[in-house]
Amino acid sequence: SWVKFNMAMILPANTADENVTMMLSTPEEIIAEARAGRMFILVDDEDRENEGDLIIPAEFASTNMINFMAKEGRGLICLALESHRCDQLGLPMMVTRNTSRHETAFTVSIEAREGVTTGISAADRAKTIAVAVDDDTHAHDIATPGHVFPLRAKEGGVLVRAGHTEAAVDISKLAGLKGA
C-alpha cells in the first residue's frame, strides 16, 4: 500500500521497479508545505546525487521531526544556513580544501552552548537548531564541535548551485520564513 508523505509518495521496499510511479509536487505545493511547517522530500536529478532528503524549515524543527529524520532517514541531521548567518555565528568551514564530489559546504558541527545535555538526543538537536536560527543568538551561544551539521548555502541559491542546501534555503525564504 502507498503511504502519503506531504506531497511525495514513499513506496514499500519490496515494490518492483516496473510498478514504481513517482508523484512530484509543484514548487507552489512545496512552498505551501514549508510555510505550514510540514516536512517534505526534496529529490534531485538521477544524474546528480540521485537521492531524496527530508527537509523541514528550521523554524519548525521540533524534537518529533528530528527524531523522525534520525530514525527513518538514517543520515546526518544537517542545518542549511545562508552564508551571512554562518558568518554571524562564526562558523568556519569544516575543511579548507573541499574535495567532495558536489562540494557540499559543511561548516564545523555545532551544539547549543546552554540547554542541552549530551547534544545527541533529538531534543538536544532540535534545541541546537532553534538556537542557531534565533535572531538573538550570537557566536558565543554556539559550541563546536557538536551533533548538528550546518551547511553553508551559496549566495544566489539554486541559480548558482543546484544543491539541496540552496534549495532548502530558497524554499524557506519563498515561504516567508528564515533562510534555514
Q: Where are the model-predicted features located?
A:
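Catalytic domains of riboflavin
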Residues: 7-180
